[in-house]
């Protein structure tokens, strides 16, 4: 497992914060589009998904330096988090504009169904993002199992020092 330092964690943590606030903003803006949608009920879901998933990315960005994960697990968590959160917003946004989503979101869609291609795309997005978010949450929980591994060459070694 590669050790991570604050300087190596900072770019990904900052990127998660940027992507989180951007998705939060997209979620807010989606609320203004509801009257233009074929199914505003699913559009409301998109509005909420953007806002809530934006907050999830913000929370993940803030806790990022606390995660004890190797390089590969960190890259996977980052990629799955970004994909899962943005796909959730986009899939419900498209379903709202298309008047689709009845196959995967029967309650939210309120009986609206789209073409086979639209329903297939929405189904793929919702299933894949759900699996992605499960992986992200499992990795984050695993990463919080212990104190993060840090290498700090500026601080004195912990514990008793041998006599000189």
From Swiss-Prot:
It is found in: Cell membrane. Coiled coil: none annotated. Its EC number is 5.4.4.1. It is an enzyme of class 5 (isomerase). It catalyses: N-phenylhydroxylamine = 2-aminophenol. GO terms for cellular component: plasma membrane. Keywords: Cell membrane, Isomerase, Membrane, Transmembrane, Transmembrane helix. It is a multi-pass membrane protein. Addition of ZnSO(4) decreases the activity to 70%. One of its GO terms (molecular function) is (hydroxyamino)benzene mutase activity. The chain crosses the membrane at residues 16-36, 50-70, 78-98, 121-141. Disruption phenotype: Mutants can still grow on nitrobenzene. Its main location: membrane. Not expressed in strain JS45 under standard conditions, but is functional when expressed in E.coli. Catalyzes the rearrangement of hydroxylaminobenzene to 2-aminophenol. This is Hydroxylaminobenzene mutase HabB.
